[in-house]
Amino acid sequence: MLTGSIVALVTPMDKTGEIDFLTLKQLVEFHIKSGTAAIVAVGTSGESATLDVDTHAKVVIKALEFADGRIPIIAGNGANSTSEAVLLSKRFADSGIIAGLNVTPYYNKPTQEGLFQHFKAIAESCDLPQILYNVPGRTSVDMLPETVARLSKIKNIIGIKEATGDLNRLADIKALVADDFALYSGDDATGCDFLLQGGHGVISVTTNIAPVEMAKMCEYALSGQADLAKKIDNQLAPVHKYLFIESNPIPVKWACAEMGLLPSADCRLPLMMLDKKYQPIVRNALIEAKLIS
C-alpha cells in the first residue's frame, strides 16, 4: 500500500493558459529529491476541470515520462460524466500509472446509488486501480461511509481520498472497510490527526511548497511519533489555512511562484491569479511556516 505524503501537483501554465512542460519536469524532479511518496497529476490542484481530455491525458503521461519510474504517478481521472471518466481510465491503463483518482461527480449531484454505479462502471472498465475522492465542499455531493464500504468490495477500488476534514468520518469508514483499503486525507489542516488516527497518507496541497516537511510529518505520524509529527504540523499550520484563502489552486500557485517553483502563478479561466489583497497574507504564512525569509 502506498503511504505518506502524496502531492496534489499544480499544473504549470503560461499567461495564455498553455501548459509549461519544462516547469512540470522541474516540479517532478523537485518532488523526487524532496522525498514525496507519489504525485497526483491533474487532480483538483492541477486544474482538471479546465483541461480538455487530450490535454489532461498529455499532462499525466508527460509527468509519468518525467518521473521515469522514480516516483509513482497517480492520474486525476475523475469527471462528472461517467463516460468521460471511463475514457480517461482506459487511456491510463497499462501506461505505468499506478492508480486513478476519481472525484465524486460535481454539479449534477447524483444519489448514493448513482455514485455507486458511477464508480463501479469506472472500476469495471479496465484494470487500472481506482482511488475514490470525496470532497463535498467542491462537488455539493457527499459520498457516505456506507457507499464507500459497498465500493470497497469491488476489486479495482483500492482506497479513498476523504476531504471532508471530519475525523469522525475516518472512524466511520475505517469501521466498514478491510484493513488493506487505503485511507488518504484530502484536508491538510487535519491531515496529521488523520494519520495519527489510523489513516495511511495525505494527498496534499501543502506538499507543493513544503515537500520535505510534509514527508517528515507523515513519517513521524505513521510511526506513532505524535509529538514530532505535531511539531511540524504546527509549523505548517499557517499555510494549511491560507492556501485556501481563495479557491484551490489559486493561492498555492501564487505561493509556488513566490518561492521560485513556478515562473508564473497563472491559472486557466475562470480561475484568476490570487487577489492582490490576499498576497501579503499568503506571503506572511510562508514566512511563519519558515518556508521563506
From Swiss-Prot:
Keyword vocabulary terms for this entry: Amino-acid biosynthesis, Cytoplasm, Diaminopimelate biosynthesis, Lyase, Lysine biosynthesis, Schiff base
GO BP: any one term: lysine biosynthetic process via diaminopimelate
Pathway assignment: Amino-acid biosynthesis; L-lysine biosynthesis via DAP pathway; (S)-tetrahydrodipicolinate from L-aspartate: step 3/4
Localization of this protein: Cytoplasm
E.C. number(s) listed in UniProt: 4.3.3.7
Gene3D superfamilies: Aldolase class I (3.20.20.70)
Site (Part of a proton relay during catalysis): 44, 107
GO molecular function, a single term: 4-hydroxy-tetrahydrodipicolinate synthase activity
Residues at the active site: 133 (proton donor/acceptor), 161 (schiff-base intermediate with substrate)
UniProt keyword annotation of Ribosomal protein present: no
Free-text function comment from the UniProt entry: Catalyzes the condensation of (S)-aspartate-beta-semialdehyde [(S)-ASA] and pyruvate to 4-hydroxy-tetrahydrodipicolinate (HTPA).
Assembly behavior: Homotetramer; dimer of dimers.
Protein's UniProt name: 4-hydroxy-tetrahydrodipicolinate synthase
Family: Belongs to the DapA family.
Higher taxonomy: Bacteria, Pseudomonadati, Pseudomonadota, Gammaproteobacteria, Alteromonadales
InterPro entries to which the protein is assigned, alphabetical: Aldolase_TIM, DapA, DapA-like, Schiff_base-form_aldolases_AS
Pfam short name (any one): DHDPS
Keyword Cell membrane attached: no
